[in-house]
């Protein structure tokens, strides 16, 4: 089981404020937040994750980190007595109201004796010098893999495998479509598939999506396997299978991002959209080594 690194004893001699990082979102966003926690914990040993909001979070599949990666939840939970103190003195409300949008801004905004971090931190720049530790922490819990997933993984390892992930679902809702749902169009995926096919003509595409029917209708694939067996609480196994591929085509989704990032092959080719959202400001979201496919 992964253990949170023990801080240098010299770090403990300096009085530091408690740093709390709010946990929220689906699995992909939870992983970005946990990655920030691990990186910060090295320099600031009094860093904890605030899981209190996850008790009432029913979207996606709730809090999944301890189950998917067998991470030690007790090592980063806030003690119950501390939560009561925080609620009593309104620390949480005050600090969320004053939070700002970047790591630099957070470090400048000290609210003794506590600093509250609220965001998604979707960039490897937050943990660029801590990648090995992140990969170790995000080792999938093999005991929970279904027989079908195990069999498919073995089959995948016999060929030049490329994952293609298509996210639709909530992205099609009016409040999300313009900013998120209009980015990874059929044209984007077709360009990415054509690019990969030119590089790897014998490749086999493994398709993961919450709308397989749409992919079959709109994206022409030369040699495709559509993965549909991971549903509900087993959805995370799609990320595991994506990470087992040699190369990846990602959607503008944190779930998709991690599936490609956890691919351990040094020579992997990852195709990503040239923009992540229509709103912009996401230039650093994808690693520089990933191949940007133009999005109109």
Task: Please give the residue ranges for each predicted region.
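A short, glycine/small-residue-rich beta-strand->loop->alpha-helix junction that serves as a flexible
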Residues: 22-32, 56
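Donor-binding and catalytic core of enzymes assembling or modifying cell-surface/extracellular glycoconjugates
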Residues: 27, 190-280
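Leloir-type glycosyltransferase catalytic cores
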Residues: 278-296
């Amino acid at each position: 089981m992964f253990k949170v690194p023990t801080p240098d004893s010299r770090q403990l001699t300096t009085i530091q404020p408690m740093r709390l990082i709010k946990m929220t979102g689906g699995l992909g966003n939870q992983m970005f937040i946990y990655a920030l926690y691990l990186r910060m914990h090295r320099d600031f040993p009094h860093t904890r994750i605030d899981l209190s909001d996850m008790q009432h979070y029913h979207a996606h599949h709730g809090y999944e980190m301890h189950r998917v990666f067998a991470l030690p939840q007790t090592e980063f939970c806030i003690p119950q007595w501390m939560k009561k103190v925080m609620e009593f003195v309104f620390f949480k409300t005050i600090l969320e109201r004053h939070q700002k949008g970047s790591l630099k801004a957070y470090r400048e905004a000290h609210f003794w004796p506590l600093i509250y971090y609220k965001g998604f931190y979707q960039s490897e720049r937050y943990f660029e010098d801590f990648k090995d530790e992140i990969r170790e922490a995000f080792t999938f819990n093999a005991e929970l893999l279904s027989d079908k997933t195990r069999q498919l993984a073995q089959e995948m390892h016999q060929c030049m495998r490329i994952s293609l992930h298509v996210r639709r679902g909530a992205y099609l809702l009016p409040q999300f479509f313009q900013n998120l749902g209009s980015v990874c169009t059929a044209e984007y995926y077709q360009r990415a598939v054509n690019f990969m096919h030119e590089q790897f003509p014998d490749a086999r595409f493994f398709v993961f999506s919450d709308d397989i029917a749409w992919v079959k209708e709109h994206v022409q694939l030369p040699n495709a396997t559509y993965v549909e067996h991971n549903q509900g609480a087993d959805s995370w196994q799609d990320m595991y299978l994506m990470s087992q591929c040699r190369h990846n085509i990602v959607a503008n989704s944190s779930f998709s991002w991690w599936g490609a990032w956890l691919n351990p092959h040094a020579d992997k080719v990852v195709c990503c959209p040239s923009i992540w959202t229509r709103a912009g400001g996401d230039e650093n979201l994808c690693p520089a080594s990933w191949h940007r496919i133009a999005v109109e």
